[in-house]
A protein has these predicted regions:
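Conserved catalytic core of nucleotide polymerization and phosphodiester-bond processing enzymes
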Residues: 1-141
Length: 141
């Protein structure tokens, strides 16, 4: 952690400001505006307060990632439907979208996954995606 904070010196200040802002207004938000209330930040119990601080630090990042994967999921589903493909979006695992595709569609399905996942939001730093295929989930990893 110390090496990480030394490499990215502004993160510590950002985290402290995020906690202070959350304590003042009672919530944190994702980049898409989804709010998470954090009454734990005002607890007299140290453990509960520390838990609230962890949630305040993590929610803007992990919550935004959850928002992004949901947007990508909708975009992939629509593309598969609009292109009348047999491929189906069947599962999400954290930041993964799992698509079941006939072999004849595997390459096109992979292209759609990459395009829609990388193109669903525009940030200063582009999102990149790894796409893997296999006969089963284990083989694809």
């Amino acid at each position: 952690l110390q090496t990480y904070l030394a490499t990215f010196p502004n993160i510590d200040g950002y985290m402290e400001k995020t906690i202070a802002d959350a304590r003042q207004c009672g919530y944190v938000s994702t980049l898409f505006g989804r709010r998470r209330a954090l009454p734990e930040l005002n607890s007299n119990n140290h453990n509960i307060r520390a838990s609230g601080e962890r949630m305040a630090r993590n929610t803007p990042i992990q919550g935004t990632a959850a928002d992004v994967i949901k947007l990508a999921m909708v975009r992939v589903w629509r593309r598969l439907r609009d292109e009348k493909m047999e491929s189906r979006l069947i599962l999400t695992v954290h930041d993964e979208l799992i698509v079941e595709a006939p072999e004849a569609e595997a390459e096109k399905a992979a292209q759609i996954l990459r395009e829609e996942m990388e193109g669903c939001v525009q940030y200063a730093v582009p999102l990149s995606t790894d796409v893997h295929a296999g006969k089963n989930w284990l083989e694809a990893h």
